Amino acid sequence: MSGEKIKIVLLILGAFVIGSLWTKVQYLEKTKNQPPLPTNNVAQAPSDNGAPIKVSVDDDPVLGDKNAKITLIDFSDYECPFCKRHFTDTYPQLKKDYIDTGKVKMVFRDLPLNFHVNATQEAEAAECARKQGGDAVYFQYHDQIFTKTTSNGTGLALEQLPIIAKDLKLNVDQFQQCLDSGEFKNEVEKDLADAAKVGATGTPTFFIGRSTADGVIDGIKIVGAQPFSAFKAIIDEKLK
């Protein structure tokens, strides 16, 4: 290859490298201030750094004794496979050992991921069930969704939502009207906004702390489908 051709090749390669670097810089500049998108969480380390985070229970449904010493806040998505894994593998023991015994109250807050197409409507449906039957019925509806869904996108057919309401002896016409009207759209969106504020960027994300009069706890963060032992260690420490 002649010297002239070598120069041309080097110039082309140099231009390509510079162009690639420029594109990368532009992309990083564009995305550096954007919040991370919510994701499904596999089992990860129990917390970010162990430092408590202030998190509110808001006005969301409570399972267990409202005067329990410990509050567990659960930010979840009804179509998240790791949320379902928590529901099947960890939640039953948590409920038996801590919630049913009055030591812990669990507050469920919605974090439907935008790539789970039915998750938002399922969250609103559970709120419509709560409107008729209170927190007890809310968690019955919650349990039915997690039991029936295949999770992760395919999920639960929306036609099943009023059927679950009927099975729970709710007024199906009132339920459907509530769901169709989007009555609880803002409620779900507020949960999403609050989740972002406390760094709950994936599902499930939990916060455990001592209960307070105003409902704002200093919560230790647990991320992902953790085993029962991860929850037990934090709860037992908080109960001392």
Go through each PLM region and give its residues.
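Conserved short-loop catalytic and cofactor-binding motifs
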Residues: 60, 113, 149, 176, ...
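Structural alpha/beta surface segment adjacent to cysteine/selenocysteine redox centers
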Residues: 68, 73-79, 84-166, 171, ...
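A generic local structural motif
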Residues: 57-61, 91-93, 192-193
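Residue-level detector of conserved, well-ordered beta-strand and adjacent loop positions
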Residues: 64, 73, 223
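Short extracytoplasmic/periplasmic juxtamembrane "stem" segments immediately C-terminal to an N-terminal membrane anchor
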Residues: 35-53, 57
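C-terminal cap of thioredoxin/glutaredoxin-like
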Residues: 1-42, 162-240
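A short beta-strand-turn-helix
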Residues: 53-70
